[in-house]
Curated annotation (Swiss-Prot):
It comes from Mycoplasmopsis pulmonis (strain UAB CTIP) (Mycoplasma pulmonis). The lineage of its organism: Bacteria, Bacillati, Mycoplasmatota, Mycoplasmoidales, Metamycoplasmataceae. Signal peptide: none annotated. The keyword Cell membrane applies. Its EC number is 7.1.2.2. It is a peripheral membrane protein. InterPro entries: ATP_synth_asu_C, ATP_synth_F1_a_nt-bd_dom, ATP_synth_F1_asu, ATPase_a/bsu_AS, ATPase_F1/V1/A1_a/bsu_N_sf, ATPase_F1/V1/A1_a/bsu_nucl-bd, P-loop_NTPase. The record marks 341 as: Required for activity. This is ATP synthase subunit alpha 2. F-type ATPases have 2 components, CF(1) - the catalytic core - and CF(0) - the membrane proton channel. CF(1) has five subunits: alpha(3), beta(3), gamma(1), delta(1), epsilon(1). CF(0) has three main subunits: a(1), b(2) and c(9-12). The alpha and beta chains form an alternating ring which encloses part of the gamma chain. CF(1) is attached to CF(0) by a central stalk formed by the gamma and epsilon chains, while a peripheral stalk is formed by the delta and b chains. It is found in: Cell membrane. It catalyses: ATP + H2O + 4 H(+)(in) = ADP + phosphate + 5 H(+)(out).
Length: 513
């Protein structure tokens, strides 16, 4: 009887139990007062609980409540890009003076709790989503439509990896949704500032739920995923980042305790896995040719990957990038533990050239780790071990990549070849050499031609001519020592066969150091 009276039975913090001769439905919204709403999150034959959005001091036991038509259907307005919004689409902050939202919106409108598409609506992942980070794009390749967990202790660079990936999409058509779940205001400001400074605000929606609003924290990942589905179904690829699901899980635990739901390990409810699987399984690559790539972020304590939440999300996703505080303490950033990280799509999203060289880099890394204990000894090692140690040390230097300094696919491929060839004489000035090559290959006329050839030849089925590439890189590196040793700017540009613009850029960067 939908016309029956519904009243509040009890109030526990932000959870309200209601009763009445009414056919309660999960996810239904109720009006408690003029500015307080409730969301039906648990219903059975005996009890019904609402999650409250608003000040519970304004309501009391016995108050009659009214069911609403709303069931959290997300409508994605195109003016959301470049702004921070909440689950209702209200603008919380915008760099632009115009904070009004026009009526121009994506056609599709999905429910926040839409059931994930079946296998018949999905296709195999075969396109890369490049992060610009050497260690990930070479050793842990990610595909469009992949669900890739970012897991690690606080302050180990998880958010930085996500932001770097976002920045690397600047030149393509991928839309981005960054979901802030209970982040501190200072962290949120820093993220938004980075998005604006890196000129990706025009393609990014930043959604935020404050740490003191459990209602918004509970709902925001589901609402954000509905926005991602709206965009994807309109013919655009989407990257969605949940930062972080640890805060979301903590809200689920609080709700379970307040509603008397049975809890288990770490006091989490038994349906914790289901709560996150029904969210993350909505990502993927679909038959319309477009995708939703998902990066859930989870915090660990003391690098412990065996916690319930971490193991749950790892079993749902298609791989994990593990950051480690001990690696960070060694000064290596991003602090990715390659031994514990994995991408289950692997070479299926890499070109033949990248896949081939990635295998060689992986071998060098693993063999170096096996022989690392001999690296600082005076033992008489055989040539193969010495070669592995030399290449391994150089590889570790290259893995230490500056924040937001994205490497293109062709540059990553060239760096990987350099490591395998062993043409860096030693591990000194590795960063300077990379900067030199970066500017030459990006800005110099001859360098651009070389990169274009590498891009073309390293397509899905193409192969790079290693002999030609090696000869050209050796020629460029032969000039590095002379350029690095120049003490003044009164040098003969023509001596190095490089454009004046590039030579100035390279030399200025080296002088800065």
């Amino acid at each position: 009887m939908d016309n029956a009276k519904i009243v509040i039975k009890s109030i526990k913090d932000y959870i309200v139990e209601v009763q009445g001769d009414y056919d309660f439905r999960l996810y239904e919204v109720f009006q408690l007062t003029d500015d307080v709403k409730g969301f039906c999150l648990s219903v059975d034959e005996k009890r019904t609980f609402l999650l409250i959005d608003g000040d519970t001091s304004k309501i009391k036991v016995g108050t009659e409540i009214i069911p609403l038509e709303s069931r959290f259907i997300a409508k994605t307005y195109k003016d959301y890009f470049g702004k921070i919004i909440d689950i209702d689409g209200k603008v919380l902050y915008s760099e632009s003076e115009d904070q009004e939202i026009s009526e121009k919106a994506y056609e599709n409108e999905n429910s926040a709790f839409k059931v994930a598409s079946g296998i018949q609506d999905r296709v195999k992942l075969n396109e890369p989503l490049e992060t610009g980070i050497f260690s990930i794009d070479i050793l842990l390749p990610i595909g469009k439509g992949q669900r890739q967990l970012i897991l690690g202790d606080s302050k180990t660079g998880k958010t930085s990896i996500a932001l770097s990936t976002m920045i690397n999409q600047k030149e393509n058509d991928i839309k981005i949704i960054y979901v802030s779940i209970g982040l501190k205001s200072n962290d949120l400001k820093r993220i938004y500032k980075t998005i604006v400074e890196q000129k990706i605000a025009h393609k990014t929606i930043l959604m935020h739920a404050s740490s003191d609003n459990s209602f918004q924290q509970f709902l925001i990942p589901y609402v954000a995923m509905a926005h991602a589905e709206n965009i994807m179904q309109s013919g655009e690829d989407v990257l969605i980042i949940f930062d972080d699901l640890t805060n979301h899980a903590n809200v689920l635990r609080e709700i379970a305790l307040l509603t008397g739901k049975p809890v288990g390990k770490e006091a989490f409810p038994g349906d914790l896995f289901y709560s996150h699987s029904k969210l993350l399984e909505r990502a993927g690559k679909f038959k319309n040719g477009y995708s939703i790539t998902c990066f859930p972020i989870v915090r660990t304590i003391n690098n412990d990957m065996t916690s319930l939440l971490a193991s749950n999300i790892a079993s749902i996703t298609d791989g994990q990038i593990v950051t480690n505080s001990e690696i960070k303490d060694q000064g290596i950033l991003p602090a990715i533990d390659i031994g514990l990280s994995v991408s289950r799509t692997g070479s299926s999203v890499q070109s033949v050239s990248l896949s081939k060289i990635a295998i060689e880099i992986s071998k060098i890394y693993s063999k170096y780790k096996q022989n690392e204990k001999f690296s600082d000894t005076n033992f008489d090692l055989n040539d193969s071990v010495r070669d592995i140690i030399k290449k391994g040390k150089i590889l570790l230097k290259i893995l230490n990549q500056k924040e937001f300094q994205a490497y293109s696919r062709s540059f990553n491929l060239i760096i990987a070849y350099i490591v395998v060839w062993g043409i860096f004489e030693d591990e000194e000035k590795i960063y300077d050499k990379l900067i030199y090559l970066y500017f030459v290959l990006r800005y110099d006329y001859i360098g651009k031609i070389l990169v274009n050839v590498v891009d073309k030849k390293s397509g899905v089925d193409g192969m790079v001519d290693e002999g030609v590439l090696k000869a050209e890189i050796m020629r460029l590196l032969a000039h590095f020592k002379d350029i690095h040793n120049i003490k003044t700017k009164s040098y003969n540009d023509g001596k190095f066969n490089l454009s004046t613009r590039v030579l100035h850029k390279v030399k200025d960067r080296i002088w800065e150091k």
